[in-house]
Swiss-Prot record:
Chief localisation class: cytoplasm
Name of the encoding gene: cid12
Swiss-Prot/TrEMBL GO biological process terms: chromosome segregation; priRNA 3'-end processing; regulatory ncRNA-mediated heterochromatin formation; siRNA-mediated pericentric heterochromatin formation
Transmembrane as UniProt keyword: no
Reaction it catalyzes: RNA(n) + ATP = RNA(n)-3'-adenine ribonucleotide + diphosphate
Protein name per its UniProtKB record: Poly(A) RNA polymerase cid12
Top-level EC class: transferase
Entry keyword set: ATP-binding, Cell cycle, Chromosome partition, Cytoplasm, Magnesium, Manganese, Metal-binding, Nucleotide-binding, Nucleus, Phosphoprotein, RNA-binding, RNA-mediated gene silencing, Transferase
SUPFAM superfamilies xref list: Nucleotidyltransferase, PAP/OAS1 substrate-binding domain
Subunit structure: Cid12, hrr1 and rdp1 interact forming the RNA-directed RNA polymerase complex (RDRC). The RDRC complex interacts with the RITS complex via interaction between ago1 and hrr1. Clr4 has a role in mediating this interaction.
Gene Ontology terms: cellular component: cytosol; nuclear RNA-directed RNA polymerase complex; nucleus; RNA-directed RNA polymerase complex
Species whose genome carries this gene: Schizosaccharomyces pombe (strain 972 / ATCC 24843)
Domain of life: Eukaryota
Pfam families in UniProt: MTPAP-like_central, PAP_assoc
Amino acid sequence: MGKVLLELHSVPWNEEGLSDNARLYSFLEFVSPKIEELKYRKLLLEKLQTHIREVVLDAELQVYGSMYIGTTLSISDVDVSLKSPRVGELEKRRVTMVLRKYLDADADFHSSARVPRINLVDVSGIGVDLTFGNDKACRTAELQKAYNEEHPIFGRLLMLLKHWLFERDLENVHHGGIASCALSYMLIGWLEMRFHKKGIDSEVQPIRALLQKFFYFWGVEWTYELFVLRPLTGQIVPKLQKGWLNEVQPNLLSIEDPIDRNNDIGKQSFQISMIKAAFVASANELLSDKTWFSTFAITEDEMFLCKQFENVINTKRSLVEGYDSDTESDELQAGG
């Protein structure tokens, strides 16, 4: 299991003399979207709203997820909800048809999902997850953005951990992996338990050490069979008390949703045994001064995505330059 990893040598984080923090932050900068890509994502949202308004005239979109929180990676999807007005099944299907016409002929409408959604992929390779009236996800994003503003180390760690999951193909909750929301709360709960409740400043800790301790905690120390995590307060609640013990698979991850305390965010991660093994392996790897950075790598998938995005940008740039040249030529002829 896992994606194809690339062994790159001429990269900034392999330079000699870098501290551990500098290497990790250099890697993080590399896997984060550049200014041009961030602008493109905003334009993509504008296009999305324009097309949706062909069906829903006064449609208002609300961004949530990593783009709202400030933890976007180049591999991240654009998460957006049709905030208002509320629309019925017919309008959702008409929106799907419009998006198939303009953005992605293979746009997929999941009408039976807990939160109905349309998934599509832009020509740039950037994925879009459009949901309808997803108030809970938007409130979650607001909560996590506030936490990130108070504790910036949270965002940096979260981005590295999201990439770590992506490398190992463990980020897809539909395949039993860990969703971004669950990962975020695992990190918040751990930071609260181990640092903030004890009055310890997590911001001054070496980031390599934080990653190692996080992996060790969730790979070795946490008793999945017995406990539920209450993330914002770093509390531990017995599964039996919540009525969340799954007798068929008692070791499932359980996280109480701060927005809806009756919702278990972690229960869909049915590959938790495999994920725990990966946590333990990385916890051990990060202890080695010689090989610790092999915990992170660039994947073939994201290099392909990067090239796909560059091709789109270069094509548009060529069209603009061609238009400018034609305009200048026409003006010269007119002047002559």
